[in-house]
Amino acid sequence: VQALEVDNGSGMCKAGFAGDDAPGAVFPSIIGRPKQKSIMVGMGNKDAYVGDEVQSKRGILIFKYPIQHGIVTNWDDMEKIWHHTFYNELRVAPEEHPVLLTEAPLNPKANREKMTQIMFETFSVPAMYVAIQAVLSLYASGRTTGIVLDSGDGVSHTVPIYEGYALPHAILRLDLAGRDLTDYLIEDSHGTCYSFNTTAERECQRDIKGKALLYCFDFEQEMKIAAESSSVEKLYELPDGNVITVGNERFRCPEVLFQPNFIGMEAAGVHETTFNSIGKCDIHIRKDLYGNVVLSGGTTMFEGIAERMTKELTNMAPASMKIKVVAPPERKYSVWIGGSILASLSTFQQMWITKEEYEDAGPGIVHRESF
């Protein structure tokens, strides 16, 4: 029986069958409820919409994101997202497949237990397992030791991993991620005479961010060139057919990751957070971490980000240290891909938590020593 894998992110849910090379379903982790009951006449009065359905009816719905900064904050809504994943997106009966779920680093124990309880009691899955997102990204890159900078829509983490185990004392969380960059781009582009304010327009911005933004290697230099010529400008066609010019926002927006003070945030940039995370690890493994810095998540998709990280870490690390930053081309989905690989390994099959074990031991069984 093929296992299912669901990677629940703050912004997008990625789901599919273990063993596949990419998730079969990718949709926004959003729940929408009607603003007023009466508007929905003739629409089969659903009390809640999920994912892409929400996007298409966005004018008449109130939006909620059940996952904030990587952590589930609303379990009723989360259950709806899982229900939608199994029955509408993957079209499977969850009681017939083992399910691999992913969780954010430092996810509270109670949350992990709640996920387990819902899977066994609501969806009657035969077996399940919960894996840490960054660890899966590392597996996807073919490594078991390294440090992962995972940056998604709602949160970024630096996670040092040694021989397959995340080192919890050295994990750092940065509440700066894709959504903040999108918001910054919205504010920044108000100067370009095209205003983005609703969630619909926010999606446009997310699109611009993906298509037009270039990561500059040398911020000051790029800004100087931008001031002197229009060679850095890119034209972008909006969904409504209008064309706008995206100028030096192309450098300013990604620069927020390295200089959070651009958006008034008092926090270390991603390079410094990575450096600090390595500094919390045993001195004997630091060399292995510096030599295996793996980028993961949609917010690391900017061009030139690996070169920039290498440059910044080289400036901060001891002079003799060899630094290698890897940005796999499929890193937007590397968490999911790592899970797909893991759940297909013959050695992993004994790691599943079965329904019987759950019934004997209760939700706490999920904390059993991981793989």
Curated annotation (Swiss-Prot):
It is found in: Cytoplasm, Cytoskeleton. Keywords: ATP-binding, Cytoplasm, Cytoskeleton, Hydrolase, Nucleotide-binding. SMART domains: ACTIN. GO terms for cellular component: cytoplasm; cytoskeleton. Its EC number is 3.6.4.-. It catalyses: ATP + H2O = ADP + phosphate + H(+). InterPro entries: Actin (IPR004000), Actin/actin-like_CS (IPR020902), Actin_CS (IPR004001), ATPase_NBD (IPR043129). Signal peptide: none annotated. Its main location: cytoplasm. One of its GO terms (molecular function) is ATP binding. Gene3D superfamilies: 3.30.420.40, Actin, Chain A, domain 4. Actins are highly conserved proteins that are involved in various types of cell motility and are ubiquitously expressed in all eukaryotic cells. Belongs to the actin family. PANTHER family: ACTIN. This is Actin-2.
